[in-house]
């Protein structure tokens, strides 16, 4: 999927604000988020958990680096970390032990994707 995808664009718009129920249900229905829209990603937050979605390559010119954890299992087992390993869903800096525990927990069922992303998005306010 090299060309710009209108559906991917819609997902990008929706991910810049807290998720609405319909969008969350639609994402939950997609078993494999990684293969859905290409290699890059963006995130949104429903206030409790954050989710990464993959979108088209045309967002690669954005600037800030974020590490997105894609869980391919249940939506409630997602976490999103930025490059300083601050957990966006809790907005507190994790201790080293907690950080290790979380990454261990997600190690088998997730994939870490590093993305250049420069938008100040709604997940910061949840």
Swiss-Prot record:
Protein name: Uncharacterized protein YMR007W
């Amino acid at each position: 999927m090299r060309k710009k995808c209108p559906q991917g664009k819609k997902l990008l718009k929706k991910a810049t604000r807290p998720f609405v129920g319909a969008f969350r249900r639609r994402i939950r229905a997609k078993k494999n988020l990684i293969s859905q829209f290409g290699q890059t990603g963006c995130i949104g937050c429903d206030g409790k958990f954050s989710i990464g979605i993959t979108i088209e390559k045309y967002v690669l010119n954005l600037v800030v680096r974020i590490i997105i954890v894609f869980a391919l299992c249940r939506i409630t087992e997602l976490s999103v970390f930025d490059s300083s390993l601050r957990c966006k869903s809790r907005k507190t800096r994790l201790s080293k032990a907690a950080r290790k525990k979380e990454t261990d927990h997600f190690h088998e069922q997730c994939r870490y994707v590093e993305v250049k992303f420069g938008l100040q998005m709604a997940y910061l306010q949840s």
